[in-house]
């Protein structure tokens, strides 16, 4: 399989319950994974704070070179305090936010101006929900770092994934 990064979702609640970082490190060892090929996304469903459990979790990820991502940025409680306090490797702009930006001048301007603001503190941006070539081109124009969406491929099982991507040639 060519080089790729696999993202794993964890919730803030899982982090607070403790030892999710141990489960991640155990899986890395068990499957002989390279830490730079794994990325941990924190799904966001409520208020998040810098609790001792969260600080331990982040410290473990940093110590082991595992990127940390705030998922669904632009919705709910994921806000600027999350970026400031949690110091993610990158944030994933919510797919609905992306879709609105592609269909509204006002939302486009907001989206476009979030990118340099986040870049200036060395946090990268992933745009979720890229479904059309036109959206891809607009995101490149805005200097979005990573892109994700059905334009590139739909969710699939292991066998289909290996068939599609094992040769490394099915990338748009």
Positions of predicted regions on the chain:
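Helix C-cap/alpha-to-beta connector motif
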Residues: 1-10, 26-37, 64
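EAL-family c-di-GMP phosphodiesterase catalytic domain
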Residues: 11-18, 37-51, 64-172
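Catalytic-core regions built around general acid/base machinery
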Residues: 24-30, 56-64, 113
């Amino acid at each position: 399989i060519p080089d790729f990064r696999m993202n794993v979702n964890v919730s803030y609640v899982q982090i607070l319950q403790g030892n999710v970082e141990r489960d991640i490190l155990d899986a890395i060892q068990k499957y002989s994974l390279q830490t730079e090929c794994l990325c941990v996304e924190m799904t966001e469903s409520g208020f998040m704070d810098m609790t001792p459990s969260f600080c331990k979790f982040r410290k473990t990820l940093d110590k082991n070179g595992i990127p940390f991502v705030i998922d669904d940025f632009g919705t709910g409680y994921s806000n600027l305090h999350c970026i400031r306090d949690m110091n993610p490797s990158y944030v994933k702009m919510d797919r609905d936010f992306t879709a609105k930006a592609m269909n509204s001048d006002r939302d486009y301007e907001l989206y476009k101006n979030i990118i340099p603001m986040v870049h200036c503190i060395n946090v990268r941006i992933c745009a979720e929900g890229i479904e059309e070539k036109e959206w891809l081109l607009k995101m490149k124009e805005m200097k979005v770092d990573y892109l994700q969406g059905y334009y590139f491929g739909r969710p699939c099982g292991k066998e289909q994934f290996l068939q599609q991507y094992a040769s490394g040639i099915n990338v748009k």
